[in-house]
Design a protein with these regions (language model features):
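A conserved ligand/cofactor-binding region detector
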Residues: 1-163
Length: 163
């Protein structure tokens, strides 16, 4: 699956010596609520309602986003162990079937005349979001998200921003 991508848009230091960094980030959309828990970071994410349905349907059909770590079910919030062999492969195939199914549902809604704010929703699990994030203090974010207990996909977002 896809890895998070980040690009520094603006990095400046005020006369008082405060550094302000703005980063454009593209990442797996289900990680957006995780990023939004960090109140010290200003965020402006792209909306599913702003993207044409056909464009998202085509992207999900041909190039779905999803997990980069196929964690094995275990107690707790962390999936440190990863599935292997045929189980991992089977999960990846099921994920692709889910993406095709979501694309079919969205296509039907779109063709029936539903607005993209409705037609695009089934696709969100299988697509990306573009977000513009700005902060003066990234320490807490990196301490939590570049940690071994962070969800792998959120770790990937933090790593892309830090690099």
């Amino acid at each position: 699956m896809h890895r998070a991508q980040a690009k520094v848009i603006l990095d400046s230091i005020s006369p008082e010596g405060i550094r302000l960094t703005t980063v454009q980030v593209r990442f797996w959309r289900p990680m957006l609520p995780e990023l939004n828990t960090h109140r010290a970071i200003s965020k402006n994410a792209g909306s599913s309602r702003a993207r044409p349905s056909k464009a998202i349907i085509d992207q999900v059909r041909n190039d779905p986003w999803g997990p980069i770590h196929w964690g094995k079910n275990q107690a707790g919030m962390q999936a440190h162990d990863e599935l292997t062999g045929w189980r991992k492969w089977a999960c990846q195939q099921v994920w692709k079937i889910g993406a095709k199914s979501a694309a079919a549902v969205s296509w039907a809604l779109w063709r029936l005349g539903a607005h993209k704010q409705i037609a695009n929703r089934p696709l969100e699990t299988y697509t990306y979001v573009d977000d513009l994030v700005t902060a003066t203090d990234w320490a807490n974010f990196f301490a939590l998200r570049l940690h071994e207990d962070a969800q792998h996909e959120m770790y990937d977002v933090a790593k892309a921003i830090k690099e």
